[in-house]
């Protein structure tokens, strides 16, 4: 159910939990970045954290793309920090507003899908703008025999076209699967306690320990998926820039 409005026909405004948490994530990112951009001579911990995060992604982009990587840092860093904050905040165990329970917006296919489309729009734009039709040579191995080129080229093209889907599905599946596990074992806890029996209480305790374990793993997965998306984005852009 939406927090405000309804899905009835003719309703011009519907405010969902997904929209709420998107705004919360964006606000948290803004506060984090604003608080760490003071540029003090002796930086505090907050400034060190922000500068360290930017430096981490900057190094990743420069290593993956090369000297031209600086111009692509804004998008790679934006994707990285949005995924990181969205994934981590979706694991918060409390609600900020009534009816607005924690929600991982990246567990929705549309969010990761749009981010993937932006990445590949950049890849195609950079590739054709920089190299023209020579960009298509990316799909044809230079030193392969002519007979093999007709076989390898379609395979390389299909591999390239599949990349947006893999980029979409990786964070989506990782976060969605973890939340499904938490939901299932959370139900085990409730049902076990409601049974008022020794076996039921035992199941509840075991399920609770498993929930704690999965929650810790989810925090690691949240950071890993943000890193994987950023590094793959850098590598795909590198191929468009350097044609290799």
What would you call each of these model-derived segments?
Residues 1-244:
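Selective transmembrane helix interface/packing segments
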């Amino acid at each position: 159910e939406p927090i405000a409005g309804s899905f009835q026909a003719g309703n011009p405004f519907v405010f969902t939990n997904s929209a709420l948490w998107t705004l919360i994530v964006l606000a948290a990112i803004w506060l984090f970045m604003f608080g760490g951009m003071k540029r003090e001579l002796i930086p505090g911990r907050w400034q060190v954290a922000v500068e360290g995060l930017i430096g981490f992604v900057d190094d990743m982009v420069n290593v993956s793309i090369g000297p031209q990587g600086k111009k692509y840092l804004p998008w790679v860093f934006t994707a990285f920090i949005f995924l990181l904050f969205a994934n981590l905040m979706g694991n918060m165990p409390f609600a900020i507003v009534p009816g607005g329970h924690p929600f991982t917006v990246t567990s929705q296919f549309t969010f990761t899908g749009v981010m993937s489309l932006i990445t590949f729009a950049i890849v195609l734009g950079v590739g054709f703008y920089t190299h023209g039709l020579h960009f298509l040579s990316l799909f044809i191995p230079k030193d392969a025999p002519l007979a093999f080129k007709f076989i390898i080229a379609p395979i390389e093209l299909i591999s390239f076209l599949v990349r947006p889907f893999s980029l979409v599905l990786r964070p989506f599946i990782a976060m969605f699967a973890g939340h499904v596990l938490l939901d299932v074992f959370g139900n085990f806890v409730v049902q076990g306690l409601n049974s008022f029996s020794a076996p039921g209480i035992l199941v509840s305790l075991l399920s609770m320990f498993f929930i704690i374990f999965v929650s810790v793993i989810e925090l690691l997965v949240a950071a890993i998926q943000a890193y994987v998306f950023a590094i793959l984005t850098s590598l795909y852009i590198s191929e468009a820039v350097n044609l290799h």
